[in-house]
């Protein structure tokens, strides 16, 4: 058993440089730890970026071990400074996120930013075209040249159950939407069966009351000539699950021996599965080989940040190693020909191991995040990080901006559709298809195309700051009633 690294005070920061800036016009870009961590550029005058609005969110949405100071900028593995418009961009970045992801900070003192890191990083002054986002794209090119260029697979357009039905999704809902796909001639290549089919968080091979059987559920999709995809949160174990009751030894623990809570969700505490435990690893193998045997060829693994939380594991490994080993285990079960999508996942440690990656928060029927928490589900929050991480598209993986939601009840649906179109890679519809009006159906038809694989070019698709505006969009009611 390894000692709990999270109990330590962490590595010391060392100063790298001092960058003169225009306090009124300079900007600093922060790259967040995982999918839902805010990633965008801020005015130097802000003094720092978005931070957790409640302490427990440090674990579930940010980086548990590395809380950011209120009066400094902080990037996980990547931070960039544009001292003034048109000036060369200072890109401070890690060397290899497969082993460690240093934290980088920039503290403003008058008209200078003091830059420091707690690990090995390089600082490049980029005077190329495209400003800040051009410099970030060139960093991403250098990074994959050093660690290996991922293979980008073809990803067809999809439909997912989540944003219409959430945990209330049933087999009847599935059948109704499969019928609608045929009737509306929607080019859905993969149907993703999202959170709702399973008996519990951690009980992945037992169906919920809404489904007769898991193999039958997947079979219904295959019988329509479409591919089946399935959602799991494989590194979470819910306190109410049978897995938790029967296998408490499968959990990652703190130095005092208490199981680490990764998140409170589904009305229960959710703990971290220790995938280095031989029996827990065997369980993961059983889950994913079973789904593959049933016919699933697309796998969305969610809440994956849990697997990289530092703690006491069966094997003497750090969190990043444990996380990457868990992804490799899953890949070995589903095969190289299957599609693997990560969400809520550590960014740099995932490069080269996943096909598609969520790059922002969840969208939602509402525009503004509750309580101003920019890592929580809200469409404005999703816009900010989807645009802020657009440079990773076609370089680290294929970007998932999150699903297109186009029914009339969605605040800002037209603005969100524009973001998906301009900055996204993967295309996924997630409305009840009988809830779409004329605008929603036309938009869904137009945007449901195969995923882009080309690298995002910030010179061709410049940042549109109007997408961030703080005036709440109206709920549009286009001509035509829901079908």
Per-segment meaning from a language model:
Residues 214, 319-327:
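Amphipathic alpha-helical segments in well-structured domains
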Residues 311-320, 353-356:
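Short glycine/threonine-rich loop-to-helix capping motif typified by GTGT followed
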Residues 132-150:
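N-terminal carbohydrate-binding accessory modules
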Residues 155-159, 164-289, 298-301, 306-315:
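Aromatic-lined carbohydrate-binding/catalytic grooves of carbohydrate-active enzymes
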Residues 244-278, 282, 325-436:
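Glycan-recognition surfaces
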Residues 295-297, 359:
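Glycine-enriched alpha-helix->loop->beta-strand junction motifs that scaffold or abut catalytic
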Residues 1-137:
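N-terminal accessory beta-strand-rich subdomains and adjacent acidic, glycine-rich linkers
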Residues 174, 180, 184-185, 207, ...:
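Carbohydrate-binding surfaces of carbohydrate-active enzymes
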């Amino acid at each position: 058993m390894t000692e709990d690294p999270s109990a330590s005070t962490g590595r010391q920061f060392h100063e790298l440089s001092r960058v003169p800036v225009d306090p009124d016009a300079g900007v600093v870009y922060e790259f967040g730890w995982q999918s839902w961590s805010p990633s965008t550029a801020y005015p130097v005058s802000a003094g720092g970026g978005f931070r957790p609005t409640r302490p427990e969110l440090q674990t579930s949405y940010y980086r548990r071990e590395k809380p950011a100071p209120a009066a400094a900028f902080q990037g996980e593995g990547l931070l960039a400074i544009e001292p003034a418009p048109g000036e060369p961009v200072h890109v401070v970045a890690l060397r290899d996120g497969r082993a460690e992801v240093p934290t980088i900070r920039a503290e403003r003192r008058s008209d200078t930013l003091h830059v420091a890191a707690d690990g090995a990083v390089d600082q490049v002054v980029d005077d190329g075209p495209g400003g800040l986002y051009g410099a970030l794209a060139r960093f991403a090119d250098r990074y994959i040249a050093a660690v290996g260029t991922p293979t980008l697979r073809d990803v067809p357009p999809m439909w997912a159950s989540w944003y219409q039905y959430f945990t209330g999704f049933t087999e009847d809902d599935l059948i109704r939407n499969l019928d609608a796909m045929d009737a509306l001639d929607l080019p859905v290549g993969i149907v993703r069966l999202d959170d709702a089919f399973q008996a519990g968080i951690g009980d992945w091979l037992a169906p919920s009351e809404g489904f007769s059987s898991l193999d039958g559920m997947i079979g219904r999709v295959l019988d329509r000539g479409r591919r089946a995809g399935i959602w799991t949160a494989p590194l979470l174990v819910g306190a109410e699950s049978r897995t938790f009751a029967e296998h408490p030894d499968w959990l990652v623990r703190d130095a005092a021996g208490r199981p680490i809570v990764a998140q409170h969700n589904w009305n229960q505490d959710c703990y971290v599965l220790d995938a280095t435990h031989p029996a827990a690893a065997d369980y993961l193998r059983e889950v994913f080989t079973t789904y593959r045997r049933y016919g699933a060829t697309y796998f969305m693994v969610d809440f994956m940040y849990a697997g990289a939380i530092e703690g006491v594991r069966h094997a003497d490994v750090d969190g990043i190693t444990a996380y990457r080993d868990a992804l490799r285990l899953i890949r070995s079960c589903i095969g190289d020909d299957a599609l693997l999508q990560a969400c809520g996942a550590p960014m740099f440690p995932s490069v080269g191991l996943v096909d598609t990656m969520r790059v922002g928060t969840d969208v939602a029927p509402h525009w503004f995040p509750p309580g101003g928490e920019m890592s929580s589900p809200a469409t404005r929050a999703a816009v900010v990080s989807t645009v802020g991480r657009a440079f990773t598209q076609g370089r680290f993986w294929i970007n998932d901006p999150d699903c297109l939601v186009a029914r009339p009840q969605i605040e800002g649906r037209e603005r969100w559709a524009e973001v998906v179109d301009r900055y996204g890679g993967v295309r996924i519809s997630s409305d009840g298809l009988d809830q779409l009006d004329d605008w929603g159906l036309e938009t869904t038809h137009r945007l449901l195309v195969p995923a882009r694989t080309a690298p995002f070019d910030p010179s061709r698709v410049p940042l549109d700051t109007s997408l961030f505006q703080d005036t709440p969009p109206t709920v549009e009611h286009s001509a035509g009633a829901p079908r």
